[in-house]
Amino acid sequence: MHGGGPPSGDSACPLRTIKRVQFGVLSPDELKRMSVTEGGIKYPETTEGGRPKLGGLMDPRQGVIERTGRCQTCAGNMTECPGHFGHIELAKPVFHVGFLVKTMKVLRCVCFFCSKLLVDSNNPKIKDILAKSKGQPKKRLTHVYDLCKGKNICEGGEEMDNKFGVEQPEGDEDLTKEKGHGGCGRYQPRIRRSGLELYAEWKHVNEDSQEKKILLSPERVHEIFKRISDEECFVLGMEPRYARPEWMIVTVLPVPPLSVRPAVVMQGSARNQDDLTHKLADIVKINNQLRRNEQNGAAAHVIAEDVKLLQFHVATMVDNELPGLPRAMQKSGRPLKSLKQRLKGKEGRVRGNLMGKRVDFSARTVITPDPNLSIDQVGVPRSIAANMTFAEIVTPFNIDRLQELVRRGNSQYPGAKYIIRDNGDRIDLRFHPKPSDLHLQTGYKVERHMCDGDIVIFNRQPTLHKMSMMGHRVRILPWSTFRLNLSVTTPYNADFDGDEMNLHLPQSLETRAEIQELAMVPRMIVTPQSNRPVMGIVQDTLTAVRKFTKRDVFLERGEVMNLLMFLSTWDGKVPQPAILKPRPLWTGKQIFSLIIPGHINCIRTHSTHPDDEDSGPYKHISPGDTKVVVENGELIMGILCKKSLGTSAGSLVHISYLEMGHDITRLFYSNIQTVINNWLLIEGHTIGIGDSIADSKTYQDIQNTIKKAKQDVIEVIEKAHNNELEPTPGNTLRQTFENQVNRILNDARDKTGSSAQKSLSEYNNFKSMVVSGAKGSKINISQVIAVVGQQNVEGKRIPFGFKHRTLPHFIKDDYGPESRGFVENSYLAGLTPTEFFFHAMGGREGLIDTAVKTAETGYIQRRLIKSMESVMVKYDATVRNSINQVVQLRYGEDGLAGESVEFQNLATLKPSNKAFEKKFRFDYTNERALRRTLQEDLVKDVLSNAHIQNELEREFERMREDREVLRVIFPTGDSKVVLPCNLLRMIWNAQKIFHINPRLPSDLHPIKVVEGVKELSKKLVIVNGDDPLSRQAQENATLLFNIHLRSTLCSRRMAEEFRLSGEAFDWLLGEIESKFNQAIAHPGEMVGALAAQSLGEPATQMTLNTFHYAGVSAKNVTLGVPRLKELINISKKPKTPSLTVFLLGQSARDAERAKDILCRLEHTTLRKVTANTAIYYDPNPQSTVVAEDQEWVNVYYEMPDFDVARISPWLLRVELDRKHMTDRKLTMEQIAEKINAGFGDDLNCIFNDDNAEKLVLRIRIMNSDENKMQEEEEVVDKMDDDVFLRCIESNMLTDMTLQGIEQISKVYMHLPQTDNKKKIIITEDGEFKALQEWILETDGVSLMRVLSEKDVDPVRTTSNDIVEIFTVLGIEAVRKALERELYHVISFDGSYVNYRHLALLCDTMTCRGHLMAITRHGVNRQDTGPLMKCSFEETVDVLMEAAAHGESDPMKGVSENIMLGQLAPAGTGCFDLLLDAEKCKYGMEIPTNIPGLGAAGPTGMFFGSAPSPMGGISPAMTPWNQGATPAYGAWSPSVGSGMTPGAAGFSPSAASDASGFSPGYSPAWSPTPGSPGSPGPSSPYIPSPGGAMSPSYSPTSPAYEPRSPGGYTPQSPSYSPTSPSYSPTSPSYSPTSPNYSPTSPSYSPTSPSYSPTSPSYSPTSPSYSPTSPSYSPTSPSYSPTSPSYSPTSPSYSPTSPSYSPTSPSYSPTSPSYSPTSPSYSPTSPSYSPTSPSYSPTSPSYSPTSPNYSPTSPNYTPTSPSYSPTSPSYSPTSPNYTPTSPNYSPTSPSYSPTSPSYSPTSPSYSPSSPRYTPQSPTYTPSSPSYSPSSPSYSPTSPKYTPTSPSYSPSSPEYTPTSPKYSPTSPKYSPTSPKYSPTSPTYSPTTPKYSPTSPTYSPTSPVYTPTSPKYSPTSPTYSPTSPKYSPTSPTYSPTSPKGSTYSPTSPGYSPTSPTYSLTSPAISPDDSDEEN
């Protein structure tokens, strides 16, 4: 669809991409215009007399009815006709239920009578709204609505303005104002809705109808809306062009086409109509009835009923789930499916059919393991392979293979299913009688069966992350399941217990290329989610690897040979055996070392490694062989296990991937598996019941432990019964008891488990699996052998089910271990029935949990993805969403991709000042130490040179500053960070590669180190730009890495620790730079989806419910999925809101002070400190009823300070709890004060002393005096005293705050045990120290109040309530808090997610300046397009809004494009490729007129001597011959610049404009990347370093077949000798033409006219002379300035900077030649310019080549025409066998210079004397001309270069020899454009005359008798002014027209003016080069 070509055969019409989608409401006129049923649909019936009825609901004009029929409107058949809308004219308008709410809003904004806006549009507020809501019509309506809500009168002009205080000038302005608004001044009704009806009510009686409330008919609303002006529509957020308010009321109802409501034909004749058709029938019926009644003048109530019914039917057609309305049913009682239900929900139209569809070319079956496949292969059953097809385009190269497949048809396996002819006909081979009769032609497509090597996508649902869909290569295997390598199960999360997987076969070559380059399994080994590998070695291989690398594994010679057989990368050398006598034995480690690729270095530990071995004097000795050291690719010591080969960061696999690349790592995986599994076959591994039996002593031990544990539990129970158990702080007695019991039982289980494990021997097979990490854990072993342990439900012991017991077998209230679910048996011993039951309870809980969790996390993941789906890295490296809002300025804040970073330690952060100085300061005073580390001359330099010493001091200063910065960034002293380029490992690599001896002094100058690091850090650019902001951003992005770089590569460590040589150091810097650049995130990467998956995937692994920390007396916090849900929903009320309060100063260390603060925070009510309350009738206070209070009460009443008479006889006595009072530091006085403050004088409150035995408050009501008098009268109303007192009591207990903050219900105080909560300080001597300080943690939050408390640290105190942090501290704080909370949730169960994903989520949620929840309320309130929103949630509402407001969707996001089936702007879709049209002229046409190049059978040209695995070439690889030929057809004579002699391209006049005759410069030929064959540096297919040089080897090169091992199998189409466009018989090609390229066969070196002694005619012809850069034999490294390049030739000024061969920008015009491309590195040995074949003295180098023009831009050395092959190579020369070393050093495939090999000259035979250019018989017109024998006829099939036996001169040159493919399309020496020196080279154009200065026409070699060559021939006459070399235009070097006649000194080719640097001559000045 992209780009406009015809899509896949369905419709021939070209499609353009949709740029935006406009929504709107259709107006009645538009509906009628669009409708195909004139006059509307009148009849509810569908058929009449068995025929569809015109004007009925199956009107034949609306679409096709029968399968066989045609549409009456468009005459299309079922597949073609899209259906056409009809319409129904409603008798009366009705409301559209989707717009009902909008209708009401608009009604409330305009005047009910005059339709004016209720707010004057000149009102400044309106202007403000309009300015603020550009492009957001919905927002505009909301704001205007808010303004209008308060208006209840439609004002006239003046009052309106005065009200707003607008100054009123007198006179005319007044009138204009009044006109301006001119309201009618009437009161506005309130609009109410009931069901589907609207009512208007007035506060005052309405003037018109004298009623307060009237029914608002749709007509009336329609009238009001009609009168609204367009301007006011706009203010109301409508877009008058697309959606006017009155259109929201249905007057004409569109009838959907038949294809939308197809009728189902049942058996028999009856049709089952669709729900919509039923609904429409109802509407038509009632509409007709209404119209009849109206015409007949029926009673008003009848009509009203009809309208109501019509309204109901229209509404339920749109939405049948309306609240408050009955459902519209079918007869059967099933609710009808309305339009809304069709769209919404998972199965609806949007999510079910547009966003996701079922696809073709997919297969699904069960998976089974196969360790012998490579990780990127998948075994496909033959039955599937024979059913799935791939459409391959027929080209001359694959025609034979495809013809064979077609012959086999569909019945045999490698066959084909269909042929698609170029006219679109599809031939089905399944039903074709004789497929062998079908002939193919190029351009047809053959749908062939899937075969080995095809690329497919393999997927397992649920697709949680991008590693759930990966590219694999097919391997056809027998039987019916997919087979895959064991290691790939981890990313797919697959196992083989019956899982099924899906396979998709991509149908185009682009898709294939993308999968191969981006999604193949090996490229996915390292996940960006947590920067570690996702695949490791698993199962039996892992078990075996651990056994195999133990110390005592020895292998015999036979075994070793056998294993080496399985090592695919084995080089044929058997290593020296470790043991020689008595017989040679090899160790397992030796064999494993052969598997390890490259020079890998790695240190890990084995799983059983004891920690105490890491430090101490013996840290280098590992007695248990548990330290793994791999050095330089050799396993030196250590047993490998899951730690080294698993999916952990820094494992061997990870390092291999980072250092060696994905392909080598793929082999590593395969080799480990094949070799080790085959060893395991010899060795064996089994497990039986015997492995699970321990010895009797162990069993005794276990019994005793359990007995003791039970005893302990009983003791605890007794303690609890006797009330001796002290509750731990913050817990109740029950909790304390449970915690203790749990602890005892868990300890018992652990203890028995460990004793069981100790008893197992080293050879136990259980143990060997656990130790290697393959399966199982220690718990599993202990459960099998010792004890199963306690069963839990919801984190507690099994609860009592009924009657206080768990099961009826136990007594009531039994808290003992057995009754509450402790299983004391092991699995081996078997469980008792009760134990079994409890065990099942625990297990069942796990199942339920899993099921619930899956749904929860699935939804979370979907929301995450939808909220971030379009967030991507753009080409300016910022991270933006689809509406181009910046989310992050640099991805992950450092601009790096997640896959390429690793954990590293910052060396300077931790050590104390002393250690820091010792390690990092270069001590130039200590001479002895210097001599040990540096070489003598360096020592002298350092000691004597003050400048150096200053530099070194400065370096140390810089590191000290870095350390300060680090300590601010990481205040906790945690030095583990994630950075690119593992420096320590790179240094280690350097030491190995350069064989550094760490004991010898180094020759690396300290200053060089300092300078080198400085230079390097300048090169590591993340943010380009030189303005202050960019510079700051660059510093922020690279700060950590630079610090790390400076501290690792500091001069001291270089000299002392690493001892690198200068050379090694340079290599290291280069390596760091390139690795760093590779780590930068790619633009186009969809980081949003990546982040969403990286968070969603670990969430799936989390447990759903919160297990509380058993036994810890801390608050419970929500964790896991519920907490994640709270965070991303931004819930206002989290389940467990909590503050962490840090304290200041003394309080932090002093428990008492901390307790004071705790009391100040914790909310205390009276209830919390009350022991009991009672109400007494106690009329006489002096002798109180409560005897114990008598004493102190008397004290009060002896001297009352109040009126004793007023006291009520009722007494409220409150007894307080002494313990709680002291806990909360409360005194009686405080409480009494609070009571008095609350109730004042109405209560009398007395209390006893704080030290009294019981603390008592006595409270009485005080009656006021007046009440005393009037008591009798008012008895009725007054509450009794005792009742009143009771109310006061409850009020006091609950509502009265004694102290603290209301929201904070409880505060816990604790000393942190973990370091992350301790206070970290830095001591004087610079060490980190963690101090324990008291921390308060609260239940409930009130951040604002707590922060303002005294002694609270306002900086560190924080809340876990996100919303609260936002309100208190703002958006930046909440972003950090959110990030921290998310990190906490994820890391709680030990997962790790790279920071950049969390950061991206937090930034997405906060980048708008407010918190955006990841729910429909957040995501769908953004400014994204309606299509994206409707694909998330609220589908119909979103679309209705969009329509009503006339919104448009700019189609920038992912969902939008997927819905419309377009390429989304993501990844490879977010850029376009620029086609260089100029270059297209040089495209080669593929000769399509030969029956088949491969006619000679498999050895023919197709398979070459290196048959490719696919058998030839994948057809679709040659896009050229689909209509593109002319575009690339510079070769076809019909095209202007072709070779036709008269064609403009070659006429001297045309060229002269362009080039001033400089032969090398012509518009027709400039080989830049656009030329179809040029390989681009990124060319994915570079099979060999050499190959890259050949331009024809680019992926697009038609002939290129990616899998052909030899590179150029000679099938390149462009070379068929019979191709009309350059068949030598073509007239313009006459070889006798003088300028016919000398390498053309007709100048055979043996032909007399070609004497190599002629100075200017070196055997390879001057036109290929080395000075012609386009033919430089050294190709890329050839540069005219390259000093080794004939330095004596003046034209190569060695000083010209612009050509330095090492300059990376070396290829000014073509990326494909960039010297950095692997295959052309100038240092590559094959390019050495001194290689014999390029010695500057070789005649072929003569700088005097006539046509060489150094200034010609297309001769830049990048011109593809420089074949790297040796110029002087002549195949007939004996020493040039193709094996000769300098034969084409970089490109095996061809040497254009070999005259004998120009395949395009079919009849050429280098030794044939008759072939001289003058040979009369070689007339261009003789097509079948054969110089020596009929078999040479160029069209003769035998002669095709594909004929294997054809060899022009010697057997070595068979064209099938892959080394020599004649077919490289670009280098045809005979191609006119390939005369490298003259692009426009048409043999007949005069331009190329021999008069070029060095081409001396009198040179004897040129047989002057040659008729065409006559030097006097006018066209070439050397004197002809047009072509005279002296003519200014011709001077090859003279751009400016200065005359260089060849006789003039200036033109001597050796004269200095000819030098490239001479300013007068370089049009392509150095700036162009760089």
Curated annotation (Swiss-Prot):
Q: Which cofactor does it need?
A: Mg(2+)
Q: Family membership, please give it.
A: Belongs to the RNA polymerase beta' chain family.
Matching entries from SUPFAM superfamilies are given as: beta and beta-prime subunits of DNA dependent RNA-polymerase
Which residues are reported to carry the modification Asymmetric dimethylarginine?
R1810
Where is the Glycyl lysine isopeptide (Lys-Gly) (interchain with G-Cter in ubiquitin) crosslink found in the sequence? Answer: K1268
- Name used for this protein in its record: DNA-directed RNA polymerase II subunit RPB1
Q: State where DNA template strand binds.
A: K346, R358, R1416
According to the record's subunit comment, the protein's assembly and interactions are:
Component of the RNA polymerase II (Pol II) core complex consisting of 12 subunits: a ten-subunit catalytic core composed of POLR2A/RPB1, POLR2B/RPB2, POLR2C/RPB3, POLR2I/RPB9, POLR2J/RPB11, POLR2E/RPABC1, POLR2F/RPABC2, POLR2H/RPABC3, POLR2K/RPABC4 and POLR2L/RPABC5 and a mobile stalk composed of two subunits POLR2D/RPB4 and POLR2G/RPB7, protruding from the core and functioning primarily in transcription initiation. Part of Pol II(G) complex, in which Pol II core associates with an additional subunit POLR2M; unlike conventional Pol II, Pol II(G) functions as a transcriptional repressor.
Q: Which residues bind RNA?
A: R67, R460, D499
Q: Which residues carry this modification: N6-methyllysine?
A: K1838, K1859, K1866, K1873, K1887, K1922, K1936
- The record lists Zn(2+) 2 as bound by C111, C114, C154, C184
Q: State where composition is biased (Low complexity).
A: 1546-1568, 1608-1959
Q: Which Pfam families match?
A: RNA_pol_Rpb1_1, RNA_pol_Rpb1_2, RNA_pol_Rpb1_3, RNA_pol_Rpb1_4, RNA_pol_Rpb1_5, RNA_pol_Rpb1_6, RNA_pol_Rpb1_7, RNA_pol_Rpb1_R
Q: Which residues carry this modification: N6-acetyllysine?
A: K1866, K1887, K1922, K1936
Whereabouts are the sequence repeats?
1593-1599, 1615-1621, 1622-1628, 1629-1635, 1636-1642, 1643-1649, 1650-1656, 1657-1663, 1664-1670, 1671-1677, 1678-1684, 1685-1691, 1692-1698, 1699-1705, 1706-1712, 1713-1719, 1720-1726, 1727-1733, 1734-1740, 1741-1747, 1748-1754, 1755-1761, 1762-1768, 1769-1775, 1776-1782, 1783-1789, 1790-1796, 1797-1803, 1804-1810, 1811-1817, 1818-1824, 1825-1831, 1832-1838, 1839-1845, 1846-1852, 1853-1859, 1860-1866, 1867-1873, 1874-1880, 1881-1887, 1888-1894, 1895-1901, 1902-1908, 1909-1915, 1916-1922, 1923-1929, 1930-1936, 1940-1946, 1947-1953, 1954-1960
Q: Name one GO cellular component term.
A: nucleus
